[in-house]
């Protein structure tokens, strides 16, 4: 489950890896997004209190934040919170304000870093599930259906399956239980309901149901937190969504859920420990776990990556900065250009003059650029996550067939082989007669 939030860092217990890496990752986010061309806005957040007990929780969070080094924290009364966010409930008695919290496009955040790695020589082996791991004189042999990979060092960052991957080598010292979170994605007509991330007081199961703007002008609402046995269960439920809706209305009573355009769910990797698991196996030196990365995992990711580099250096691996580092090629965002810039781009490539996705003003040129990017998509959802085609109010009802045709043309495959998402999600069952 991912809310596209760059968390401030007041929630984790001081002294934990989670606390340190959350604050470090938050500080890194702005520079990374600016450098890689990722949509990001440091909008700030409010944690709401509706009773005296929750006011005490805010005080605890404030003290944690101070200990963790979170900048600019302030405790507000209810009137102060509503002065910032007029659509908050009159029942709000107090709030914790964290100006360093932000919102980001989570797919592009991850893709931009991955594409930069590919541009600089990293090879991705996608659709290659790990089936076995064995020790060798030189380190490890990782087996997949598409071949075997010899490595001196292995980093296990397999999300909710991290404990299962570790078990292919040896018994892991932890277990992971998936926790499902369900969401509403609201139309842009609701985007102005709040300008900051609105939290309720956190509990043991998570940071609670939030209401937040997105970098694309929508509103995201959710999630709940429900332990599920199936590590692939990302289905939504009537009961879960009803809970999210009821809880969110407590914070922002004016939300119009008739403007919902999409429901979805995701899974958090909840481990049997109360912290991120970032360590080398004692029994198998050279095998590292980066596991149990639940919230604030997205925020912490850049800092976790830096820690992985540090772990390798501690093993004596000589790592030098690449002298001819290649910057990521930024894709044009047609809707964000001025009229003069749009005209110049169309003169250069006429495909930018053909709008395919009307809801988000995404052009054929942008879709083609995504399909020929360093990590090209092969599905409608893959295109959507890279350039937003199909992300708007109609959710691909208008542009979906056109995007499908462009994918087939650019990849040189029959249109009936174009997928919606993962393997097997075919859109066309057979040719019409």
Question: Which residues are covered by each model-predicted region?
Answer:
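Helical element adjacent to the flavin cofactor pocket in flavoenzyme catalytic cores
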Residues: 96-153
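C-terminal catalytic lobe of FAD-dependent flavoproteins
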Residues: 112, 202, 206, 215-216, ...
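Flavin-dependent oxidoreductases
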Residues: 133-222, 226-237, 246, 255, ...
């Amino acid at each position: 489950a991912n809310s596209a939030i760059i968390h401030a860092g007041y929630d984790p217990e001081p002294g934990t890896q989670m606390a340190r890496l959350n604050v470090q990752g938050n500080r890194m986010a702005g520079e990374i997004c600016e450098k890689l061309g990722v949509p990001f806005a440091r909008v700030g957040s409010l944690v709401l209190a509706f009773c005296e007990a929750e006011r005490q929780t805010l005080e605890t969070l404030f003290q944690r934040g101070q200990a963790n080094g979170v900048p600019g924290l302030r405790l507000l009364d209810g009137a102060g919170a509503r002065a910032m966010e007029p659509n908050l409930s009159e029942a709000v008695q107090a709030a914790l304000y964290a100006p360093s919290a932000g919102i980001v496009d989570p797919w592009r955040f991850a893709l931009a870093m991955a594409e930069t790695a590919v541009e600089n020589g990293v090879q991705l082996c996608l659709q290659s599930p790990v089936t076995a791991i064995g020790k060798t004189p030189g380190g490890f042999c990782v087996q997949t259906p598409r071949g075997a990979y010899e490595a001196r060092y292995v980093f296990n960052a397999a999300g909710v399956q991290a404990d299962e991957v570790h078990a292919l080598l040896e018994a892991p010292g932890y277990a992971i239980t998936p926790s499902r979170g369900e969401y509403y994605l609201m139309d842009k007509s609701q985007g102005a309901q709040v300008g900051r991330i609105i939290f309720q007081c956190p509990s043991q199961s998570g940071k609670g149901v939030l209401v937040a703007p997105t970098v694309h002008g929508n509103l995201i609402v959710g999630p709940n937190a429900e332990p599920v046995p199936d590590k692939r269960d990302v289905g939504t439920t009537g009961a879960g969504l009803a809970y999210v809706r009821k809880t969110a209305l407590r914070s922002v009573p004016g939300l119009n859920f008739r403007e919902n355009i999409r429901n979805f769910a995701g899974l958090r990797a909840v481990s049997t420990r109360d912290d991120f698991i970032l360590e080398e196996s004692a029994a198998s030196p050279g095998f590292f776990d980066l596991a149990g990365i639940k919230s604030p995992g997205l925020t912490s990711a850049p800092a976790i990556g830096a820690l992985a580099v540090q772990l390798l250096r501690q093993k004596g691996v000589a790592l030098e900065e690449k002298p001819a580092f290649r910057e990521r090629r930024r894709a044009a965002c047609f809707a964000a250009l001025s009229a003069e810039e749009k005209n110049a781009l169309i003169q250069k490539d006429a495909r930018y003059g053909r709008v395919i996705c009307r809801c988000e003003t995404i052009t054929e040129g942008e879709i083609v650029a995504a399909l020929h990017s360093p990590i090209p998509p092969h599905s409608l959802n893959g295109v959507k996550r890279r350039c937003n085609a199909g992300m708007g109010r109609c959710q691909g009802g208008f542009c979906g067939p056109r995007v499908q045709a462009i994918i087939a043309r650019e990849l040189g495959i029959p249109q009936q082989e174009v997928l919606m998402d993962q393997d097997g999600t075919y859109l066309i069952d057979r040719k019409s007669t």
